[in-house]
Structure formats: C-alpha cells, structure tokens
C-alpha cells in the first residue's frame, strides 16, 4: 500500500504566533519549543520534509503536539496500520534517499504519499512493535550504563592526575 492509503498526511505550520505553554512543537531537528496550542494529539508519526529528513518522531496516544512548518504528520487508519509500526518502518526506510535538493535536504510530500510500505496484519505489526520497543529500551539502558562508566572513568582519571601532581602514586585497586 501507499502511505497515503494507510492514513492521512497533514501539513505542519509556523508556530511563532503562539504563546509559550506545555505543548511540544516538533520541527525537523526534534522538539524546538513548547506552546499553548495543540495542533492534534497522538498517535501520530511526524516526518520532516526539510532539514533532517532521516529523523522521524512518534507521538504517543493522547499526547497533544504541534507540528512545525518543516514537517508533516501522519495519522494512521487504525484498521490498517499501527502508528508505532509505521514509525519503525519509516525509520528503516532511510528517507534521505528520496532527497530532492542539493543544499538543504528535502522530501516532497508527493514522494512520501506515494511511497510503498509493507502492511502486514495488525497482530503482526503489534508483535513487531513490542519486539523493537523492547530492543530500544535495552539499547537505552546500555547507553546509560556506558555514560555512567564514562563519568566514572573521567573522575578516576582526574583523581590520578591530582595525586601525581602532589607527588604521590595512586592506590592500586
């Protein structure tokens, strides 16, 4: 099926006229501001069409959001496509290969709308989502652990040099 057949593709718009608030504004680089007006609520997949076209964003069910002018968002037909599955699918598609510009990367709405996507049964989609989300949680845990190890390494290294500056050898562990 084509993307335009699995859901509605809606355009983002400029957010500068709105006041500060709690609704996240998504642009091609991610969340750039929070305003007082929601454009829609999740589930939705936000797809940048100018700038960082390789990054897609998922908005969870019931979460209000505002889609900025450099993006479009897709509201999936619930009887056809799980929005989280579409998010993972688009992440694997490497949308940057559809780049239509030599300067600022851009993805035409028409190319996105006409892109063919794999649409398995909903039960299969939900199983894939559970598996991929579980893997992403595990990866995040590993990244957090590596960050902690890096912080410990930095502190230990600094301590070693402080002791060496004072003419003492660090204690062996």
Where are these regions (language model features)?
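A short beta-sheet element
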Residues: 27-91, 100-103, 108-112
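Short, charged, low-complexity patches
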Residues: 79, 83-86, 96, 128-129, ...
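Short, intrinsically disordered, mixed-charge
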Residues: 88-95, 134
